[in-house]
């Protein structure tokens, strides 16, 4: 049996389809002091979303364009100047806060990128532009492809490869495998936590299925693309996986992490934090994991399959071949327990897929009449 619909490009909802999102502080917890995070100011509507300040007992965190930035406040040279963003928001300088947060996502912002972003924001904020079309609509009307070209500018091979990774993500085998594994996630598992969400491709999948999802990443610019274009019904939070997860205990009912975990240095700390924020019995999926025998071109901290088996031991992991999961998916099925492999059988594999649970049991993937990646509409 093969589902009938062909794949779409971005499973994106337009802004008019956006549902009611939770308040920015809902379920947030400071990764530093462990205290609850609450609103310190009223939310104010600004360019591309709401702006405000959140706080706990030890720090304040800005909300820029509807995205809470839960990063540790650091000095003037920090990649994301959290304190400076807070001062801009308190002063009502929302356009400057947006530009600063977006530029801070770049390791080395190019002059051309700075100019193009500054000009676009100024144009969107001009009185004439506001009369013709609200700023958020100006950005939503701009394609995600064009925004990604701004995020990774220039003709260099590295920028082109990274840009194409996000543009053509729905057609990648590892993305298809992730949706096959995610087929076991049900509506009553919500909300789902999407770790290292990037521009929100997996978040769009859950939104199209009517499952609430929180997407987190350290890259504010990619999250902004996700919130405005790719998955506007999802909740986005900017945070650092190395610092732990900034959420309350047992807040999530499932989690998925695609092509990210091997870039995390402190893996044990992240998994300990994940066990805290997941409810009892929650399924978890770590997809497109690089392993140290085949680490790929980009610097990472991949482990051998046996290392992942040890690290995930408390979650009773099952290991799958990406090819096996994709083959099942193309036949209209999710993975079956019998498809699981012994970790050392995957030493030559490009990617490793892991399914586990937080004190529950393994579920078999469901069959589907419609490919999950064909849900939703073009952006």
Task: Tell where the protein language model's regions lie, with residue ranges.
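C-terminal lobe and adjacent flexible extensions of AdoMet/dcAdoMet transferase-like proteins
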Residues: 349-379
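A short acidic, Gly/Pro-enriched loop at the edge of an enzyme's catalytic core
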Residues: 242-255
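Class I SAM-dependent methyltransferase SAM/SAH-binding core
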Residues: 199-243
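A short glycine-rich, Lys/Arg-flanked "PGG" loop and its adjoining helix->strand segment in the class I
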Residues: 268-280
